[in-house]
Amino acid sequence: MSSPKQTPMIAQYLSIKAAHPETLLFFRMGDFYELFFDDAKQAAEALNIALTSRGKSEGEPIPMAGIPVHARQTYLNKLIEAGFKVAICEQMEPPGASKGPVRREVVRTVTPGTLTEESLLSPRENNYLVSYLPAAKRHPHALAALDLSTGEFFALTLEREDQVAAELSRLEPAELLIPDNWEPEPWLKGWKRCLSRRGSWSFDGKEGARVLLEHFQVTSLESFGVADSPPCLGVCGALLHYCRETQKEALSHITGLSRLHQQEGMVLDETCRRNLELNYNLKDGSRKSSLLGVMDRCITPMGSRLLAQWINRPLQSLDAIATRQESVSWLRENLVAYQDLRERLRMVHDLERFLSRIALRRASPRDLGGLRQTLQCLPQLYAILTPADGHSLAVPSLLRILADHFNGHEALTKQLEQQLADELPLNLKEGETIRLGFDQTLDTLRSLSRDGKSYLTKLEVEEREKTGIPSLKIKYHRSFGYSMEVTKTHLDKVPPRYIQRQTMTNGVRYVTEELKEYEEQLLTAEERMLEREQLLFEALAEQVARQAETLQASARAIATLDVLANFAHIAEERNYCRPLLHEGAVIEINQGRHPVVEQFSDTPFVANDIRLDNRQRTGLITGPNMAGKSTLMRQVALIVLLAHTGACVPAGSAKIGRVDRIFTRVGASDDLAGGRSTFMVEMTETAHILHHASERSLVILDEIGRGTSTYDGLSIAWAVAEHIHTQCQARTLFATHYHELTQLESQLDGVFNLTVEVKEWKDQILFLHTIVRGAADRSYGIHVAQLAGLPRAVTRRAREVLADLEEHAVHHPDSMGQGHAPASQPYQLTLFEDAPPSPALLELKRVDPDELTPKEALEALYRLKELL
């Protein structure tokens, strides 16, 4: 409730602000948006604009900052990038239309997860708004994601927190909605900046079902796949409710909802994405030299966004993969069609985001112009994929399905061609959006606005001839408007139809009904012209919005075609092969190359062969640094991943047994914010692999156990290798400097040694980057140090120390060097000591469940409970 000392305007501001406490309120006052109180202070600092004051509140000046209305988008961009939410409050009536302050309403709240403006979005990246409902006793975790800028909407349930974390790393939400009665767990800290708390009631399954039924105008949600999942209903409903509340629109472009199932896609956790540099490189965090960076040669933004989705969620269905592969192969074999498709796609615009802005009433004339040009291209794309020479049956089924979505837009295309001008302005208020000749009323208003002066000149000549007054002139006066001026000498010739308006010293000013009518038309022509053009434009946009569902299907078809053509383009350009995927365990890659390193190498990339199967499941790789161990392992992982997207791969040939997850433990750094050392980070990531890897997984391990003492590190690395091989039974590549691990080849069936060839010449080494069977006999660490630029005195001394250590390791294994007493391995404190066995565990080990009757089993359960 406002203080009685507040002005009516400030009282109105405070009332509106109270309803939007988490936002900066852009309060429209004439040609400016003003911000007051704390909002003004925050905006002034973030935007580097002046902080002033206006009036007083409780005796203190009210802080105020403002931005011009015409510059709103520029300042809005800066605030959103800084993490703010902004509520835009407009004047809903002309000043003076009512007593008291002008009526104002918030027409939209702009948040990081609800952006649609081109200037606020990256064209080749999705902008997901995600809602999350944590697991409870009766339901699993649930996530829903919506890209408001494209209309993509899906949900899924997950059993474990690590699965939720992996999905969030895939989606990279711009904003994450959570219930306000839930305190985020530590694992969610990485998303703290984008959290938005919402009323827990909005996550209720029944409320979600009501919102979805109302939005989609259906009586059942069975076809969407979420009807049997209250958690899915809850997160979907929370998303839609939030978007309605912030956008103040019907969201007509959200025409569908799909339910994803985790088993349908390969699981890639955040560590894997980071280590394999799928989306961003580790050097500077940009897309350059990431997998996506080198694989994205898509023509359209829609294609680039879909490619990112495919790379971040590879398929598990071999049939679905083969369907994509067939289309890529057809495009490679039909070079003319493939080149023609790529050329036609250059004329296609971002149809998905156009439709979003059209549905939300934010479309510009050029959005509709881009839609027109895109629709004009569709018949050409259809013709390429359905050749008239009778060979259409040779076109793969996926391409034929895509082609079907390019039909059916002829009427809308014609309407856009007839109604829109050829050259379109950026802004509707600039005029000239509707084609000349389409609307007679608009044409008349344009003539009035454009040709008013010539009309008055013509009228002036006509009146002189009719009245015989040669000095008659039509002039404009600010106070009286247009009038005909007649000098005193010709007043006797003034006809009765002239109406006297003003007497002057040397004559009289007159008007006629015709001039009065024209004056009214002329003075309001510009305003009425813009109103008429806006009316016609909005009607056309509404026509488009009503066809959103079919247009979105066409947009998805364009994106899919673009990605498939992109795969064909890269395969041809870089000599990639089509991999054979199968349900077996064999991963066999002949002449494989790293898809990223190859593109940035100044010298020809050295290809390598690798084979993993049930007989040789764990490859232990030894060799010096810089020799190529890490490159090889990442290369194998990336080839496997690309194969599961349907793409061709950088190899001479490849057979890939289906992989459900890729795990990587490559490099590590301190987690200072989390209070974890490099070694703790390494062990945490390794533990995650040991708990979740299966025989269907591919595991990449690089230098386990480096962050502790030599013996501890060796022991851990040995135990980890054994566990993964014997318990997880995952297909594994394990690079290590612990040469002792090579003994596992003779101890465990299926473990085999690999090494990187090195050539020595005159105290120099040459890395051949070739992987061969066998174990390395030296680490060449000093050679690498010399290459890195260590002073010669240091490397010379290092060789002396190494020679001394090696000599005494052979002749005096218990001595560290000449003159030293035998040394024992120093005791290292451990975090966890072995605890005595639990009585309950001992009792449980004695129980044979196959020998118990139901009554005995129940009694055993009670005994165990008493022992806990």
From Swiss-Prot:
Would you tell me the Gene Ontology cellular component terms?
cytosol
List, in alphabetical order, the Gene Ontology terms for molecular function in this entry: ATP binding; ATP-dependent DNA damage sensor activity; damaged DNA binding; mismatched DNA binding
Keywords for the protein's UniProt record, in alphabetical order: ATP-binding, DNA damage, DNA repair, DNA-binding, Nucleotide-binding
Q: Which SMART domains match?
A: MUTSac (SM00534), MUTSd (SM00533)
**Gene3D superfamilies, per database record:** 1.10.1420.10, 6.10.140.430, DNA repair protein MutS, domain I, MutS, connector domain, P-loop containing nucleotide triphosphate hydrolases
PROSITE patterns, per database record? DNA_MISMATCH_REPAIR_2
Give the residues the record marks as binding ATP. Answer: G623, P624, N625, M626, A627, G628, K629, S630
| SUPFAM superfamilies registered for this protein in UniProt | DNA repair protein MutS, domain I (SSF55271), DNA repair protein MutS, domain II (SSF53150), DNA repair protein MutS, domain III (SSF48334), P-loop containing nucleoside triphosphate hydrolases (SSF52540)
Gene Ontology biological-process entries: mismatch repair
Q: Which Pfam families match?
A: MutS_I (PF01624), MutS_II (PF05188), MutS_III (PF05192), MutS_IV (PF05190), MutS_V (PF00488)
What does the similarity note say?
A: Belongs to the DNA mismatch repair MutS family.
Q: So what does this one do?
A: This protein is involved in the repair of mismatches in DNA. It is possible that it carries out the mismatch recognition step. This protein has a weak ATPase activity.
- Protein name per Swiss-Prot or TrEMBL: DNA mismatch repair protein MutS
Mind giving the lineage of the organism this protein is from?
Answer: Bacteria, Pseudomonadati, Pseudomonadota, Alphaproteobacteria, Magnetococcales
